[in-house]
From Swiss-Prot:
One of its GO terms (cellular component) is nucleus. Gene3D superfamilies: YVTN repeat-like/Quinoprotein amine dehydrogenase. InterPro entries: Cdc20/Fizzy, WD40/YVTN_repeat-like_dom_sf, WD40_CDC20-Fz, WD40_repeat_dom_sf, WD40_rpt. Belongs to the WD repeat CDC20/Fizzy family. It holds the Pfam family WD40_CDC20-Fz. It is found in: Nucleus. WD repeats lie at residues 159-196, 199-238, 242-281, 287-326, 329-371, 437-477. GO terms for molecular function: anaphase-promoting complex binding; ubiquitin ligase activator activity. It comes from the Eukaryota. This is Meiotic fizzy-related protein 2. Has a role in meiosis. GO terms for biological process: anaphase-promoting complex-dependent catabolic process; meiotic cell cycle; positive regulation of anaphase-promoting complex-dependent catabolic process.
């Protein structure tokens, strides 16, 4: 099938670039309406309106303050070289990725409070206070434990752009956040710090940690990718590469130092690091006719998926990069991709605002297994390692959305709970989730620990931590994951080819 390449229209500034114009026909409108009626649960149903909007950067508060600075500065300056960088570069880092901890004594659970005021052009806004009782429960909790962010980091300069990947989590417990041209690091032990990057006017568009947390890849809108060594105390840039156009996504292999880089021209660049060097080993040309928006590996590094602004999702086997194994065409751009960590061939694909669906595919046989209507742009999908569940984050919706994250059971596709948007400064329904990531940890024997938190980047310039898959309230969750299994619960059936589609579909219901 030949996909006609669409023209690109540009207006001043990258974030206002329009990559495609889509109009809904009457047939398309009816199709979306039918999906809503057929797939909405008996719970609270969402209403889908006609959408002529795009996925890229849809600002809703054009006249609001662009950079908010918290009144609280660091109480103590770090005695490291990194702490001198803001003075050298004339940067103001007060309040960036910072919070106050008002935990009560004798509290055993790790729940931080965000008791601060944010100074804006309209004055100080009301503070968000989460009190902690000695039994570890939230005393002023609105709804369940899961609905309240347990930590909020202020992130002035966080770009509201569907096509960027501003968060990365190291398996060593370090969070990297892209704020305009800079990269900030945060950990529970050392707090926030700024990386000593070369001065530039180009924004950071993507971040990615290697599976061991030893290397951090930083990409910018001008096509440069830097590989920073995080194994040494003195951060250093080991390698630097350039590509045509901006970079929206990158992904490290879970088993080695192989890095995928998605370009704006539709190419996927494959890099591999050895003990002495890192070099490009392959270029997969014209995988997509437009920008590559998402890249994702399966858990053993034998397959990866790519999603593009041309609505295409492609599957590659690592030992056969010349040819796509499968590809599927959708009705909107695809950024959200997630392989299941306990069902090797199960892939979740989240689409943009013109489709608003999550599709589930078998990447061994190429079949579509299920689909789920979400009612908004899907910006991320995350699988639990502890329970047979997944969650997804919501971006732009024509009607607005009150939810930031929604958790579902697999394969029942019934909702466990949703997390309402916790907006700062009264964003309300205009609040969007740009990206969400897990906080899993990996050990030397290739075993994983379930991350207690899901970290989300919101359009109100905050980074929030939600505790979703902890050990509390296990009765509301689905079955626990006891071992890695196939789609049918069998490794043998997982490896069989040419299983009839009807059998495949019925096998997961």
């Amino acid at each position: 099938m030949i996909i006609k390449k669409k023209e690109s229209f540009k207006s001043p500034g990258r974030l206002w670039r329009v990559t495609k114009i889509r109009k809904l026909t009457a047939a398309k409108k009816n199709e979306l309406q039918n999906r809503k009626c057929n797939q909405a649960s008996n719970e609270e149903k969402k209403i889908l309106y006609k959408s002529n909007f795009l996925d890229r950067f849809i600002p809703s508060k054009a006249n609001s303050d662009a950079f908010r600075i918290m009144e609280n500065a660091f109480t103590e300056k770090l005695n490291t070289q990194e702490s001198l960088l803001p003075d050298i570069l004339n940067l103001n880092v007060k309040g960036v990725l910072h919070y106050k901890d008002n935990k009560k004594q004798k509290t055993t659970r790790l729940i931080e409070s965000t008791n601060y005021q944010r100074q804006t052009i309209h004055g100080a806004s009301s503070s968000l206070v989460i009190e902690v009782e000695e039994n570890g429960h939230l005393s002023n909790m609105q709804g369940s434990l899961y609905e309240t962010p347990l930590r909020i980091l202020d992130a002035p300069g966080l770009l509201d752009d569907f096509y960027i990947s501003p968060l990365a989590w190291s398996t060593n417990g370090e969070l990297a956040v892209a704020l305009a041209q800079n990269v900030y690091l945060w950990s529970e032990i050392s707090g926030p710090s700024i990386m000593e990057l070369s001065p530039t006017t180009y924004e950071v568009s993507s971040l990615a940690y290697s599976s061991d947390g030893g290397f951090l890849a930083i990409a910018r809108v001008n096509g440069f990718v830097e590989i920073w060594n995080r194994k040494t105390k003195n951060n250093r840039c080991d390698y630097k590469f350039h590509h045509d156009g901006d970079i929206s996504c990158m992904a490290w292999s879970p088993i080695n130092w192989t890095l995928l880089v998605g370009g704006s021209t539709g190419n996927i660049y494959v890099y591999r690091r050895t003990k002495s060097m890192m070099r490009r080993v392959h270029t997969i040309k014209k995988v997509h006719q437009e920008q590559v928006c998402g890249l994702e590996w399966n858990y053993d590094g034998t397959q990866f998926a790519s999603g593009g602004n041309d609505n295409l999702v492609c599957i590659f086997d690592i030992d056969s990069l010349e040819n796509k194994k499968f590809y599927w065409i959708h009705l909107a751009a695809v950024k959200a991709l997630a392989f299941c960590p306990w069902q090797k061939s199960l892939l979740a694909v989240g689409t943009g605002s013109n489709d608003q669906q999550i599709y589930f595919y078998d990447t061994f046989r190429g079949h579509r297994i299920h689909s789920l209507f979400c009612g908004a742009q899907v910006t991320s999908v995350i699988w639990s390692r502890r329970y047979k569940e997944f969650c997804y984050s919501l971006g732009y919706s024509p009607e607005g959305t009150n939810s930031s994250l929604i958790v579902y059971r697999w394969p029942q596709l019934t909702k466990v709970f949703d997390i309402p948007s916790a907006a700062i400064d009264g964003w309300g329904q205009d609040l969007r989730t740009i990206m969400a990531i897990h906080t899993h940890r990996k050990y030397s024997n290739n075993t994983w620990e379930e991350g207690e938190y899901v970290v989300v980047a919101n359009s109100d310039e905050t980074v929030k931590f939600y505790k979703i898959w902890g050990n509390e309230m296990q009765e509301i969750h689905n079955d626990r994951v006891l071992y890695r299994e196939g789609i049918f619960g069998s490794h043998i059936l997982e490896m069989l080819e040419n299983i009839p589609e009807q059998v495949l579909t019925n096998g997961v219901r």
